[in-house]
Regions:
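Acidic surface patches and DE-rich sequence motifs
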Residues: 65-66, 74-75, 83
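Compact soluble domain cores
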Residues: 2-71
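A short, surface-exposed interaction/processing loop segment used at functional sites
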Residues: 77-96
Length: 96
């Protein structure tokens, strides 16, 4: 059983943008299913914690400006994509 407080769950979800999905929950579910294993996350909360930790430590990351003024930050083989408001759109392993 996964233990997480309501406060932590709300905090982790607050870092994410719904992007092109109808809700933040659908965006998170999609990205966890697509990238969870590659970042060694066994559950969605672990994935969100890793995304938050990476996002908080972007010093030295290469930054690429993408469509719609979103930004891709790449560092040590991982990436995070953020929207204009600074909310996470995706997190995963950088493919070369």
């Amino acid at each position: 059983m996964i233990k997480i407080s309501l406060g932590e769950a709300k905090k982790l979800l607050s870092y994410w943008s719904r992007g092109t999905f109808p809700t933040v929950a659908e965006s998170v579910k999609y990205h966890f299913m697509r990238h969870g294993k590659e970042v060694s996350s066994s559950n969605v909360w672990q994935y969100l914690r890793k995304a938050e930790a990476f996002d908080k430590n972007l010093r030295g990351a290469k930054v690429y400006i993408l469509e719609n003024e979103t930004s891709r930050y790449v560092k040590k083989g991982y990436y995070v994509i953020k929207d204009q408001a600074g909310k996470i759109l995706s997190f995963g392993v950088e493919r070369k």
